[in-house]
Amino acid sequence: MTVQPTTIGIVGARGHTGAELIKLIAAHPQLQLVFVSSRELAGQRVAEHSDGYEGELRYESLDADAVAAKAADVVILALPNGKAEPFVAAIDASRPQTLLIDLSADYRFDPAWYYGLPELTRHTYAGQRRISNPGCYATAMQLAITPLREQLAGPPQCFGVSGYSGAGTTPSDKNNPALLADNLMPYALTNHMHEREVSAQLGVPVEFMPHVAPHFRGITMTVNLWLQQPLTREQIHARYLERYAHEPLIEIVDEAPWVSRIAGTQGVQIGGFTMAPGNKRVVVVATLDNLLKGAATQAMQNLNLALGWDELTAIG
Protein backbone atom coordinates (compact mmCIF):
# COMPACT_ATOMS: atom_id res chain seq x y z
CA MET A 1 0.00 0.00 0.00
CA THR A 2 1.41 3.37 -1.04
CA VAL A 3 1.30 6.08 1.61
CA GLN A 4 0.33 9.44 0.17
CA PRO A 5 2.89 12.14 0.99
CA THR A 6 1.89 15.15 3.05
CA THR A 7 1.76 18.18 0.78
CA ILE A 8 3.46 21.42 1.78
CA GLY A 9 3.85 24.92 0.38
CA ILE A 10 6.05 27.89 1.24
CA VAL A 11 5.04 31.54 1.02
CA GLY A 12 7.95 33.97 0.88
CA ALA A 13 10.55 31.58 -0.44
CA ARG A 14 12.98 34.09 -1.97
CA GLY A 15 14.61 34.79 1.37
CA HIS A 16 17.49 32.96 2.99
CA THR A 17 15.21 31.02 5.34
CA GLY A 18 12.97 29.94 2.46
CA ALA A 19 15.99 28.45 0.71
CA GLU A 20 16.90 26.47 3.83
CA LEU A 21 13.31 25.26 4.18
CA ILE A 22 13.34 23.93 0.61
CA LYS A 23 16.46 21.88 1.40
CA LEU A 24 14.90 20.40 4.53
CA ILE A 25 11.64 19.57 2.76
CA ALA A 26 13.56 17.91 -0.07
CA ALA A 27 15.27 15.69 2.51
CA HIS A 28 12.00 14.72 4.23
CA PRO A 29 10.68 11.29 3.18
CA GLN A 30 7.04 12.12 3.94
CA LEU A 31 6.71 15.61 2.48
CA GLN A 32 5.96 16.72 -1.07
CA LEU A 33 6.60 20.35 -1.98
CA VAL A 34 3.63 21.43 -4.10
CA PHE A 35 4.05 25.19 -4.32
CA VAL A 36 6.62 27.86 -3.61
CA SER A 37 5.47 31.47 -3.71
CA SER A 38 7.79 34.35 -4.52
CA ARG A 39 6.92 37.46 -6.52
CA GLU A 40 10.53 38.13 -7.45
CA LEU A 41 11.29 34.59 -8.65
CA ALA A 42 7.94 33.77 -10.27
CA GLY A 43 8.35 31.51 -13.30
CA GLN A 44 11.83 30.31 -12.42
CA ARG A 45 12.59 26.69 -11.56
CA VAL A 46 13.07 26.03 -7.86
CA ALA A 47 15.93 23.65 -8.68
CA GLU A 48 17.90 26.55 -10.16
CA HIS A 49 17.93 28.30 -6.79
CA SER A 50 18.14 25.37 -4.37
CA ASP A 51 20.91 22.80 -4.58
CA GLY A 52 18.88 20.47 -2.39
CA TYR A 53 15.80 20.28 -4.61
CA GLU A 54 15.30 18.23 -7.76
CA GLY A 55 12.19 18.55 -9.92
CA GLU A 56 10.34 20.84 -12.27
CA LEU A 57 8.44 22.90 -9.69
CA ARG A 58 8.52 26.63 -10.42
CA TYR A 59 8.09 29.63 -8.20
CA GLU A 60 4.69 31.31 -8.43
CA SER A 61 3.39 34.70 -7.37
CA LEU A 62 0.39 33.81 -5.20
CA ASP A 63 -1.92 36.05 -3.23
CA ALA A 64 -3.61 34.86 -0.05
CA ASP A 65 -6.67 33.37 -1.74
CA ALA A 66 -4.50 31.54 -4.28
CA VAL A 67 -2.41 30.05 -1.49
CA ALA A 68 -5.53 28.81 0.29
CA ALA A 69 -6.86 27.37 -2.98
CA LYS A 70 -3.73 25.23 -3.32
CA ALA A 71 -5.18 23.13 -0.47
CA ALA A 72 -1.78 22.00 0.82
CA ASP A 73 -1.75 20.00 4.04
CA VAL A 74 0.94 22.29 5.47
CA VAL A 75 1.75 25.93 4.70
CA ILE A 76 4.84 27.71 6.00
CA LEU A 77 4.80 31.50 5.95
CA ALA A 78 8.35 32.87 5.60
CA LEU A 79 7.30 36.49 5.16
CA PRO A 80 8.55 39.75 6.70
CA ASN A 81 6.89 40.87 9.91
CA GLY A 82 3.42 42.31 9.39
CA LYS A 83 2.64 40.39 6.19
CA ALA A 84 1.11 37.14 7.46
CA GLU A 85 -2.45 38.20 8.35
CA PRO A 86 -4.10 38.01 4.89
CA PHE A 87 -2.75 34.49 4.36
CA VAL A 88 -3.84 33.37 7.82
CA ALA A 89 -7.32 34.82 7.26
CA ALA A 90 -7.71 33.13 3.87
CA ILE A 91 -6.62 29.75 5.21
CA ASP A 92 -8.77 30.12 8.33
CA ALA A 93 -11.78 30.80 6.12
CA SER A 94 -11.41 27.97 3.61
CA ARG A 95 -8.92 25.44 4.99
CA PRO A 96 -8.92 25.66 8.81
CA GLN A 97 -7.52 22.13 9.08
CA THR A 98 -4.29 23.23 7.35
CA LEU A 99 -1.20 23.07 9.53
CA LEU A 100 0.09 26.65 9.37
CA ILE A 101 3.56 27.61 10.61
CA ASP A 102 4.42 31.31 10.70
CA LEU A 103 8.07 32.33 10.91
CA SER A 104 7.41 36.03 11.51
CA ALA A 105 6.76 37.76 14.83
CA ASP A 106 3.11 38.37 13.97
CA TYR A 107 1.55 35.66 16.17
CA ARG A 108 4.15 35.07 18.87
CA PHE A 109 2.02 36.86 21.45
CA ASP A 110 -1.28 35.26 20.37
CA PRO A 111 -2.41 32.66 22.95
CA ALA A 112 -4.44 30.85 20.29
CA TRP A 113 -1.17 29.93 18.54
CA TYR A 114 1.31 27.35 19.83
CA TYR A 115 4.70 28.98 20.45
CA GLY A 116 7.07 26.39 19.06
CA LEU A 117 10.44 26.22 20.76
CA PRO A 118 10.34 22.43 21.15
CA GLU A 119 13.11 22.04 23.73
CA LEU A 120 11.16 24.33 26.06
CA THR A 121 7.52 24.14 24.95
CA ARG A 122 6.82 20.74 23.37
CA HIS A 123 5.07 19.64 26.59
CA THR A 124 2.43 22.33 25.93
CA TYR A 125 1.65 21.18 22.39
CA ALA A 126 -1.97 20.03 22.29
CA GLY A 127 -2.76 19.56 18.63
CA GLN A 128 -2.85 23.22 17.59
CA ARG A 129 -2.91 23.77 13.81
CA ARG A 130 -1.42 27.25 14.14
CA ILE A 131 2.23 27.39 15.15
CA SER A 132 4.35 30.50 15.67
CA ASN A 133 8.08 29.94 15.20
CA PRO A 134 10.24 31.83 17.73
CA GLY A 135 12.69 34.52 16.70
CA CYS A 136 16.33 33.60 16.11
CA TYR A 137 17.76 35.81 18.85
CA ALA A 138 14.85 34.83 21.10
CA THR A 139 15.67 31.15 20.67
CA ALA A 140 19.28 31.70 21.73
CA MET A 141 18.31 33.85 24.72
CA GLN A 142 15.69 31.46 26.07
CA LEU A 143 17.89 28.39 25.76
CA ALA A 144 20.76 30.22 27.48
CA ILE A 145 18.64 31.55 30.35
CA THR A 146 16.12 28.78 31.12
CA PRO A 147 18.29 26.43 33.24
CA LEU A 148 18.93 29.31 35.67
CA ARG A 149 15.60 31.08 35.35
CA GLU A 150 14.47 30.24 38.91
CA GLN A 151 17.79 31.48 40.32
CA LEU A 152 17.73 34.93 38.73
CA ALA A 153 18.24 37.95 40.96
CA GLY A 154 17.53 40.49 38.21
CA PRO A 155 16.96 40.91 34.49
CA PRO A 156 19.37 38.99 32.26
CA GLN A 157 21.45 41.24 30.03
CA CYS A 158 21.87 39.76 26.57
CA PHE A 159 24.44 41.01 24.05
CA GLY A 160 23.57 39.51 20.68
CA VAL A 161 25.61 39.51 17.47
CA SER A 162 24.12 38.15 14.24
CA GLY A 163 25.41 37.60 10.77
CA TYR A 164 23.80 39.88 8.22
CA SER A 165 21.57 37.17 6.76
CA GLY A 166 19.36 37.90 9.76
CA ALA A 167 18.47 41.24 8.17
CA GLY A 168 16.82 39.48 5.22
CA THR A 169 17.24 40.05 1.51
CA THR A 170 15.65 43.50 1.16
CA PRO A 171 18.61 45.90 0.86
CA SER A 172 19.40 47.89 4.01
CA ASP A 173 22.39 49.11 5.99
CA LYS A 174 22.18 45.95 8.13
CA ASN A 175 22.79 43.59 5.20
CA ASN A 176 25.18 45.75 3.18
CA PRO A 177 28.59 44.02 3.24
CA ALA A 178 30.36 47.25 2.33
CA LEU A 179 28.94 49.08 5.35
CA LEU A 180 29.51 46.10 7.62
CA ALA A 181 33.15 45.56 6.65
CA ASP A 182 35.39 46.00 9.73
CA ASN A 183 32.27 47.08 11.60
CA LEU A 184 29.77 46.02 14.25
CA MET A 185 26.40 47.68 13.81
CA PRO A 186 24.23 48.16 16.93
CA TYR A 187 20.49 48.70 16.45
CA ALA A 188 17.17 48.62 18.38
CA LEU A 189 19.08 48.70 21.66
CA THR A 190 15.93 48.79 23.79
CA ASN A 191 12.48 47.30 23.28
CA HIS A 192 13.54 45.04 20.39
CA MET A 193 10.72 42.66 19.48
CA HIS A 194 12.80 39.69 20.66
CA GLU A 195 13.35 41.40 24.02
CA ARG A 196 9.58 41.59 24.43
CA GLU A 197 9.15 38.04 23.15
CA VAL A 198 11.61 36.50 25.61
CA SER A 199 10.31 38.56 28.52
CA ALA A 200 6.79 37.32 27.79
CA GLN A 201 7.81 33.68 27.35
CA LEU A 202 10.05 33.45 30.42
CA GLY A 203 7.91 35.66 32.62
CA VAL A 204 10.90 37.80 33.65
CA PRO A 205 12.17 41.08 32.19
CA VAL A 206 15.07 40.63 29.81
CA GLU A 207 17.42 43.32 28.47
CA PHE A 208 18.66 42.75 24.93
CA MET A 209 21.18 44.64 22.81
CA PRO A 210 21.42 43.35 19.21
CA HIS A 211 24.24 43.94 16.75
CA VAL A 212 24.92 42.93 13.15
CA ALA A 213 28.39 41.73 12.13
CA PRO A 214 30.16 41.24 8.78
CA HIS A 215 29.77 37.45 8.72
CA PHE A 216 26.82 35.98 6.78
CA ARG A 217 25.16 33.57 9.20
CA GLY A 218 25.20 32.61 12.85
CA ILE A 219 24.34 34.24 16.18
CA THR A 220 26.51 34.68 19.27
CA MET A 221 24.46 35.47 22.38
CA THR A 222 26.43 36.50 25.47
CA VAL A 223 24.15 36.49 28.52
CA ASN A 224 24.97 38.07 31.89
CA LEU A 225 23.03 36.45 34.74
CA TRP A 226 22.87 37.63 38.37
CA LEU A 227 21.95 34.88 40.82
CA GLN A 228 20.03 34.96 44.11
CA GLN A 229 22.47 32.56 45.79
CA PRO A 230 26.08 31.71 45.01
CA LEU A 231 26.60 28.72 42.74
CA THR A 232 29.86 27.17 41.66
CA ARG A 233 30.78 26.79 38.01
CA GLU A 234 30.45 23.03 38.41
CA GLN A 235 26.91 23.36 39.78
CA ILE A 236 25.87 25.63 36.92
CA HIS A 237 27.47 23.44 34.27
CA ALA A 238 25.64 20.44 35.77
CA ARG A 239 22.29 22.28 35.62
CA TYR A 240 22.70 22.88 31.89
CA LEU A 241 23.78 19.30 31.26
CA GLU A 242 20.77 18.00 33.17
CA ARG A 243 18.26 20.36 31.56
CA TYR A 244 19.31 19.50 28.01
CA ALA A 245 20.45 15.90 28.53
CA HIS A 246 17.79 14.52 26.18
CA GLU A 247 17.93 17.30 23.57
CA PRO A 248 20.00 16.13 20.60
CA LEU A 249 20.17 19.58 19.01
CA ILE A 250 21.64 21.23 22.11
CA GLU A 251 25.29 20.67 22.99
CA ILE A 252 26.69 21.90 26.28
CA VAL A 253 30.37 22.75 25.88
CA ASP A 254 32.96 23.82 28.42
CA GLU A 255 34.46 26.86 26.74
CA ALA A 256 32.56 29.74 25.16
CA PRO A 257 31.40 28.47 21.74
CA TRP A 258 32.44 30.06 18.44
CA VAL A 259 29.89 31.09 15.86
CA SER A 260 32.18 29.91 13.05
CA ARG A 261 31.74 26.35 14.33
CA ILE A 262 27.94 26.45 14.43
CA ALA A 263 27.25 28.13 11.08
CA GLY A 264 25.58 25.72 8.69
CA THR A 265 24.65 23.25 11.44
CA GLN A 266 21.24 22.43 12.88
CA GLY A 267 21.80 22.83 16.60
CA VAL A 268 22.87 25.08 19.45
CA GLN A 269 26.03 25.21 21.52
CA ILE A 270 25.92 26.66 25.04
CA GLY A 271 29.03 27.16 27.14
CA GLY A 272 31.45 29.58 28.73
CA PHE A 273 29.96 29.52 32.26
CA THR A 274 32.36 32.20 33.46
CA MET A 275 31.95 33.15 37.12
CA ALA A 276 32.51 36.56 38.67
CA PRO A 277 34.08 36.80 42.13
CA GLY A 278 31.52 35.81 44.75
CA ASN A 279 29.81 33.27 42.45
CA LYS A 280 26.57 35.27 42.17
CA ARG A 281 27.16 36.35 38.58
CA VAL A 282 27.74 34.06 35.61
CA VAL A 283 28.17 34.78 31.91
CA VAL A 284 26.83 32.15 29.50
CA VAL A 285 27.35 32.09 25.72
CA ALA A 286 25.01 30.45 23.20
CA THR A 287 25.58 30.12 19.46
CA LEU A 288 23.24 28.97 16.72
CA ASP A 289 22.68 29.37 13.00
CA ASN A 290 19.98 32.01 12.64
CA LEU A 291 18.72 30.48 9.39
CA LEU A 292 18.54 26.92 10.77
CA LYS A 293 17.82 26.43 14.49
CA GLY A 294 16.84 30.10 14.51
CA ALA A 295 14.28 29.54 11.72
CA ALA A 296 14.06 26.64 9.23
CA THR A 297 15.25 23.76 11.43
CA GLN A 298 12.94 24.88 14.22
CA ALA A 299 10.02 25.07 11.78
CA MET A 300 10.76 21.49 10.70
CA GLN A 301 10.88 20.35 14.33
CA ASN A 302 7.48 21.95 14.88
CA LEU A 303 6.06 20.39 11.71
CA ASN A 304 7.26 16.92 12.71
CA LEU A 305 5.90 17.37 16.23
CA ALA A 306 2.49 18.47 14.95
CA LEU A 307 2.21 15.57 12.50
CA GLY A 308 3.33 12.93 14.97
CA TRP A 309 6.64 12.14 13.29
CA ASP A 310 10.09 11.87 14.77
CA GLU A 311 11.02 15.45 15.60
CA LEU A 312 14.36 15.20 13.81
CA THR A 313 13.08 13.76 10.53
CA ALA A 314 14.98 15.50 7.69
CA ILE A 315 17.14 17.26 10.27
CA GLY A 316 19.47 14.40 11.14
Curated annotation (Swiss-Prot):
GO molecular function terms noted in the UniProt entry: N-acetyl-gamma-glutamyl-phosphate reductase activity; NAD binding; NADP+ binding
Keyword Ligase included in the entry's annotation: no
Enzyme class: oxidoreductase
Pfam families: Semialdhyde_dh, Semialdhyde_dhC_1
Pathway: Amino-acid biosynthesis; L-arginine biosynthesis; N(2)-acetyl-L-ornithine from L-glutamate: step 3/4
Keywords: Amino-acid biosynthesis, Arginine biosynthesis, Cytoplasm, NADP, Oxidoreductase
UniProt GO cellular component terms: cytoplasm
Catalysis performed (reactions): N-acetyl-L-glutamate 5-semialdehyde + phosphate + NADP(+) = N-acetyl-L-glutamyl 5-phosphate + NADPH + H(+)
GO BP, sorted A to Z: L-arginine biosynthetic process
Active site feature: 136
Cystine bridges: none
UniProt superkingdom: Bacteria
Presence of keyword Amino-acid biosynthesis: yes
Assigned protein family: Belongs to the NAGSA dehydrogenase family. Type 1 subfamily.
Xref: NCBIfam families: argC
HAMAP family cross-referenced by the UniProt entry: ArgC_type1
Protein name: N-acetyl-gamma-glutamyl-phosphate reductase
